Amino acid sequence: MRVSTTARLVLAGQAPGTRVNATGIPYNDPSGDRLRAWMNVSRETFYDESRIAIVPMGFCFPGLNAQKADLPPRRECRQLWHDGLFDLLPQLTCIVAIGRYAQDYHFARLGRPLPKSATLAEIVGDWKSHARLTPRIIALPHPSWRNNGWIKGNPWFEEKVLPRLRAEVAEAIAWKAIA
């Protein structure tokens, strides 16, 4: 977790994976490289917590299932810390909600709970209505290679959502350049 009361953008993901668990650096893996490319930011800017906060739904590595995939984030982090933490961050203008756990939490927190039946394509594809929330939410698939098929099957994601993401990121982090 990396948080500052000056960051206007928060990356809300699932939980640290195995590489992040080993290094202690969030998104310090190929998924992070892809996320930074999607956002059009350098590693230096990405890890500048005065500009970009990183708050996963789980603060610790949850372990692996039988298929060697990460287990869901542990609920106690969200239950104990998230509501109070986000109450201390009124300056946020944009939440990048990466994956369903973060999306479910943040949309519900802003009074717009997602239907259980909503698909990733429906959630991510509704980006125009999410832009009317305060703070705005941009829902993304996890930037893992495991979502390559979804990304290829939904070309509108790269054509419509990524330009919106880049614009939101640029706006949210620009304040520091002139502050």
Language-model segments: residues:
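A polyanion-binding, active-site-adjacent surface
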Residues: 1-177
